[in-house]
């Protein structure tokens, strides 16, 4: 792929528009997908696997070395199963897995010159070198639900009960950095993560007529 766009390492929107900070590079994307399904009486199974790789290369970024962009997900797996105990009662399971994406971590910290915060404390600034230099942990979770159907004449009532992220795996939705001072008085930027979707049970009613 040619003529790919990205922001330069020294991009600034203070004195110029966004398009003035764009640089041009090249890259490639390739992948493979496998999709399998199985059905036998009351059991339905589906398996999907995607293997992909994406690289980008810009003369002005990472000293011209190729890098993985933040949307590069190497492995992606989806396993879906449905078990029908009867025409009214069923169990559904969905397990998903995706490789961690790349993000940019600081390599150090600098002290802002003659600038303090509201409490007159010095302001610390993270120092970055290479872009997309850290791979986040892999993401995976299991969702499950039970469905029960109550048909009555023209009315169909379905009750669903289940949970997202059954085993409560901590999948980081985003990462931020918090300055912390150790016993020696040195300050480091410690990476912290936020989890948006922990274990969440639910129950729902669906009425059709």
Task: Set out the residue ranges of the language-model regions.
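C-terminal beta-signal and adjacent terminal beta-strands/loops
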Residues: 1, 88, 97-122, 137-143, ...
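Flexible, active-site-adjacent loop/turn segments at secondary-structure boundaries
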Residues: 2-5, 22, 69, 134, ...
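Gram-negative outer-membrane beta-barrel transporters
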Residues: 3, 12-105
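Context-gated lysine
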Residues: 5, 26, 40-41, 55-59, ...
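Solvent-exposed loop segments that connect transmembrane elements
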Residues: 6-20, 57-65, 109-128, 176-190
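Short sequence motifs at beta-strands and strand-loop junctions characteristic
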Residues: 24-29, 37, 69-74, 132-141, ...
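Generic recognition of flexible, low-complexity loop/linker segments
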Residues: 33, 79, 133, 148, ...
């Amino acid at each position: 792929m040619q003529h790919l766009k990205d922001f330069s390492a020294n991009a600034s929107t203070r004195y110029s528009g966004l398009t003035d900070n764009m640089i041009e590079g090249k890259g490639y994307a390739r992948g493979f997908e496998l999709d399998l399904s199985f059905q036998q009486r009351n059991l339905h199974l589906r398996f999907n696997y995607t293997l992909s790789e994406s690289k980008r290369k810009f003369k002005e970024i990472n000293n011209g070395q190729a890098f993985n962009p933040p949307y590069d997900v190497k492995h992606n797996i989806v396993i879906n199963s449905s078990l029908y105990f009867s025409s009214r009662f069923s169990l559904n399971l969905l397990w998903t897995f995706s490789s961690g994406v790349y993000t940019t971590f600081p390599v150090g910290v600098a002290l802002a010159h003659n600038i303090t915060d509201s409490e007159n404390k010095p302001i610390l600034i993270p120092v970055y070198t290479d872009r997309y230099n850290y791979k986040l942990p892999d993401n995976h979770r299991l969702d499950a639900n039970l469905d029960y159907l109550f048909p009555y004449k023209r009315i169909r009532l379905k009750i669903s009960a289940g949970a997202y992220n059954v085993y409560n795996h901590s999948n980081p939705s985003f990462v931020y950095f918090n300055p912390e001072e150790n016993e020696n008085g040195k300050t480091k930027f410690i990476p912290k993560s936020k989890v948006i979707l922990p274990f969440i049970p639910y129950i729902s009613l669906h009425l059709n007529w």
